[in-house]
Amino acid sequence: MNDAHFNIISKDKNSITVEMINYDNTLLRPLVEEISRDDSVDEIHYYIKHPNLDNPQIHVKVKSGKPQSAIKKSIRRIDRIYNSLIDDLEREEKRLNVSK
């Protein structure tokens, strides 16, 4: 994934729409699912106008707090999950190497 980044399309007090540049469903679906678990989030929409021509966008509306904070918190939670998976895999590799 080269040069992946966000572009803010629109933002107000309770909502934000973000275009995801150089991202694919592999990362975006877990992000949208994680954002939807946030109690402060009222709505989350993920859409692509045309899969070959347009970048995906997510729209987040919150009941409280800042919408960009909900996205940031979700990214941090996903990061912890993936880091935990890496740690688990490394422990398993060590365990298997010790038993040989």
Curated annotation (Swiss-Prot):
InterPro entries membership: RBP11-like, RBP11-like_dimer, RNA_pol_Rpb11_13-16kDa_CS, Rpo11-like
Chief location bin: cytoplasm
PROSITE patterns: RNA_POL_L_13KD
EC number: 2.7.7.6
Keywords in alphabetical order: Cytoplasm, DNA-directed RNA polymerase, Nucleotidyltransferase, Transcription, Transferase
SUPFAM superfamilies: RBP11-like subunits of RNA polymerase (SSF55257)
Parts of the chain that traverse the membrane: none
Pfam families in UniProt: RNA_pol_L_2
Reaction equation(s) it catalyzes: RNA(n) + a ribonucleoside 5'-triphosphate = RNA(n+1) + diphosphate
One GO-annotated biological process of the protein: DNA-templated transcription
Function: DNA-dependent RNA polymerase (RNAP) catalyzes the transcription of DNA into RNA using the four ribonucleoside triphosphates as substrates.
Record family assignment: Belongs to the archaeal Rpo11/eukaryotic RPB11/RPC19 RNA polymerase subunit family.
Subunit relationships: Part of the RNA polymerase complex.
Annotated protein name in UniProt: DNA-directed RNA polymerase subunit Rpo11
Species of origin: Picrophilus torridus (strain ATCC 700027 / DSM 9790 / JCM 10055 / NBRC 100828 / KAW 2/3)
